[in-house]
A protein has these predicted regions:
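Predominantly a Rossmann-like dinucleotide-binding segment in NAD(P)-dependent oxidoreductases
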Residues: 7-12, 17-109, 163
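A generic structural signal for well-ordered alpha-helical segments
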Residues: 2-4, 146
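C-terminal helical cap and adjacent loop that interface with cofactors, partners, or active-site loops
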Residues: 171-176
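Contiguous beta-strand/loop segments that form the cofactor/metal-binding neighborhood of enzyme cores
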Residues: 78, 82-169
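Short beta->alpha connector loops at strand-helix junctions that form conserved
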Residues: 1, 15, 135
């Protein structure tokens, strides 16, 4: 952001994932109180596109893990921020405190390619966030589960036209 300001250019993130109709429906269900008090949100954004250590020789990939070009974060800044925004958007709460475990699973990388983050939201909700670029078998896996005192919701970006709603002591309904 500071570099962009000094350069006179705009630095912005397009949080397009919250534009999906069923993500907006999740937000309205939470705001309406359908889930009651939100107890926990589990969100992940994982993929395995950077699992190959040989990518260190690929200039199209190398910059992502170079602090001089990417800044202070790798995978979290690339994908994890979308997961955090999703949790904030759906819950209507903002991050208040967090504890993060960032790790480079490939020794040649200076920035993280995997992260676990525990977040306390300003409304009291806890968020468990995992983001990884070395999760072989995951394909652009943005998923969110919201657990409240009256029920739970589950949405996956791989199946964006389906939202699972499970009320306490009820059957799961697939909303399409």
């Amino acid at each position: 952001v500071a570099t962009a300001a000094r350069s006179g250019v705009v630095c912005a993130v397009n949080y397009g994932y919250t534009g999906y109709p069923l993500v907006r429906h999740m937000r309205s269900m939470v705001a309406r109180g359908d889930l009651g008090k939100i107890r926990l949100i589990v969100v992940e954004f994982s993929h395995g596109f950077h699992a190959n250590a040989a990518d260190a020789d690929n200039p199209r990939m190398r910059w992502r893990y170079d602090p001089a070009q990417a800044g202070i974060s790798g995978q979290f800044a690339d994908c994890g921020i979308h997961a955090l925004h999703m949790a904030s958007y759906v819950s209507g709460q903002n991050a208040k405190e967090l504890a993060a475990d960032f790790v480079s699973t490939i020794a040649s990388r200076s920035l993280e390619d995997d992260a676990m983050v525990n977040v306390r939201m300003d409304g009291g909700t806890r968020v468990r966030l995992w983001t990884s670029s070395v999760a072989v078998g995951s394909f652009h896996g943005l998923n969110i589960r919201v657990f409240g005192e009256k029920g739970g919701l589950r949405w996956a970006q791989q199946w964006p036209d389906q939202l699972n709603w499970t009320p306490v002591n009820g059957r799961t309904e697939v909303i399409e």
